[in-house]
């Protein structure tokens, strides 16, 4: 879908969350890639953190960012697989008010084009919590690239037509 260059680009504030038991700041290649994508697209990197694969820790961090009026969107990397320690989708589900099922569906479709049937092991997901977008991507740099380039780059661009997530932001808190 096209970017309408006659429309004004509206940058948003995005927090990047890396979920990993094994990665520290020095080894966070997926988080680094995601932060670079956010900035390169013209958005503001509002915050960044690395947390352990723990439902309570993840959901607590998400809730703090959702409560922060300076954060419009959270994108995480890691913890979306099938192992016992992969708890990101459960943590996100505790926080969001509404799920965005099409995000995970489209992510897996895009992943299929890159990694074939291995895409069935991904539980990438998204939702909205109190007006803040929450997106959970797998932990590999390739998956981050697929999710950003294939979905988030355009959906977080206010010029994308026929619609985008940014233009919905003022209406997310409607009752």
Describe each region flagged by the PLM.
Residues 1-175:
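Non-catalytic beta/alpha edge segments that cap or flank active sites
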């Amino acid at each position: 879908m096209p970017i309408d260059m006659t429309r004004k680009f509206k940058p948003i504030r995005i927090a990047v969350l890396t979920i990993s038991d094994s990665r520290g700041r020095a080894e966070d290649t997926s988080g680094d890639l995601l932060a670079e994508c956010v900035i390169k697209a013209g958005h503001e990197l509002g915050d960044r953190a690395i947390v352990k694969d723990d439902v309570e820790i993840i959901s607590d961090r998400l809730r703090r960012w959702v409560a922060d009026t300076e954060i419009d969107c959270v994108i995480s990397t890691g913890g979306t697989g099938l192992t016992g320690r992969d708890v990101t989708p459960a943590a996100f589900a505790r926080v969001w008010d509404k799920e965005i099922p099409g995000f995970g569906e489209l992510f897996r479709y895009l992943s299929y084009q890159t990694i074939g049937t291995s895409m069935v092991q991904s539980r990438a997901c998204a939702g909205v919590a109190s007006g803040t977008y929450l997106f959970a991507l797998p932990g590999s740099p390739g998956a981050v690239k697929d999710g950003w380039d294939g979905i988030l780059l355009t959906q977080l661009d206010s010029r994308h037509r026929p619609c985008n997530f940014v233009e919905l932001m003022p209406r997310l808190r409607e009752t």
